């Protein structure tokens, strides 16, 4: 019975890891054992930060909406409550986009919300 040699599989696996480690500093880019550790850690960071990015953007959108709403005399919380009362179903990403790039449309939205809030008070 012929003996099984696994050199090609090992070589392919090493090559895959070293390809992912391209651009790393020092031996992390060309020494397999070190590269494997760095690549695994990098993939952990990537996994974690894909989730953190969603949180970060939501926070950014809220900050932008709050700033734009306060320019018109409303707080973020009151503005969002007013939107719910009016029945406007826009997400924070779109509202932040409006607040930054479409100020006149956002002002109309604020006006609508303000009138509804005054009506309910």
From Swiss-Prot:
One GO molecular function term of this record is:
structural constituent of ribosome
- Check the record and name the Gene3D superfamilies matching this protein: 6.10.160.10, Ribosomal protein L20
The alphabetical list of record keywords is:
Ribonucleoprotein, Ribosomal protein, RNA-binding, rRNA-binding
Q: Does the keyword Ribosomal protein apply?
A: yes
Q: Its domain of life?
A: Bacteria
Query: What InterPro entries would the database entry show?
Result: Ribosomal_bL20, RIBOSOMAL_L20_CS, Ribosomal_protein_bL20_C
Q: Does the keyword rRNA-binding apply?
A: yes
Q: Which GO terms describe its biological process?
A: ribosomal large subunit assembly; translation
Q: Which GO terms describe its cellular component?
A: ribonucleoprotein complex; ribosome
Query: What is the similarity comment for this entry?
Result: Belongs to the bacterial ribosomal protein bL20 family.
> What is the stated purpose of this protein?
Binds directly to 23S ribosomal RNA and is necessary for the in vitro assembly process of the 50S ribosomal subunit. It is not involved in the protein synthesizing functions of that subunit.
Task: Kindly provide the name given to this protein in its UniProt entry.
Answer: Large ribosomal subunit protein bL20
Task: Give the organism the record lists.
Answer: Wolbachia pipientis subsp. Culex pipiens (strain wPip)
């Amino acid at each position: 019975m012929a003996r099984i040699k696994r050199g090609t599989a090992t070589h392919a696996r090493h090559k895959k890891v070293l390809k992912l480690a391209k651009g790393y500093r020092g031996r992390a880019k060309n020494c397999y054992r070190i590269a494997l550790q760095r690549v695994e850690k990098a993939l952990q960071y990537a996994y974690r930060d894909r989730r953190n990015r969603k949180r970060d953007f939501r926070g950014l959108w809220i900050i932008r909406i709050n700033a734009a709403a306060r320019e018109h005399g409303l707080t973020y919380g009151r503005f969002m409550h007013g939107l719910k009362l009016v029945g406007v179903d826009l997400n924070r990403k779109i509202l932040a986009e409006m607040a930054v790039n479409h100020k006149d449309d956002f002002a109309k939205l604020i006006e609508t919300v303000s009138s509804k809030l005054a009506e309910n008070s």
